[in-house]
Amino acid sequence: MDNFRVIYRILRYIERSMDCEEFDEEHFTAACFGVTETRFFYLLAALVADGYVVGIRCEEVASGRYVVLISPQLTLAGMEYLAENTMMKKAYRLAKGIKDITPGA
């Protein structure tokens, strides 16, 4: 699966969870996003390091890799990423729709 698609889904999941009292950790797993544990760890670590999310700690120690969830939330940068990518998807669908109905295109 494309990394950026997984990143979008992770951010979207966190954004939707901001309306809930408690974060649903049960469905916030590598398996739920269709990636390996290793890829999930590194994608989350990148999102934290680049300032898209807070409330997640990614720890790599001798005994393994651990993701610690402490009330995950999007930062403004994370919200902007979601907004920009949502607009890009809409523009893509619009352009594709125009192409589909345009003869000879």
Where are these regions (language model features)?
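Short amphipathic alpha-helical interaction segments
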Residues: 33-56, 69
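Short, surface-exposed loop/turn segments at secondary-structure junctions
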Residues: 25-26, 30, 59-65
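Short amphipathic alpha-helical interface segments
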Residues: 3-32
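Short, amphipathic alpha-helical interaction segments positioned at domain boundaries
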Residues: 62-97
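Alpha-helix N-cap/helix-initiation sites
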Residues: 3-4, 20-22, 37, 88, ...
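Generic structural signal for hydrophobic core residues of well-folded globular domains
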Residues: 11-17, 47, 82-85
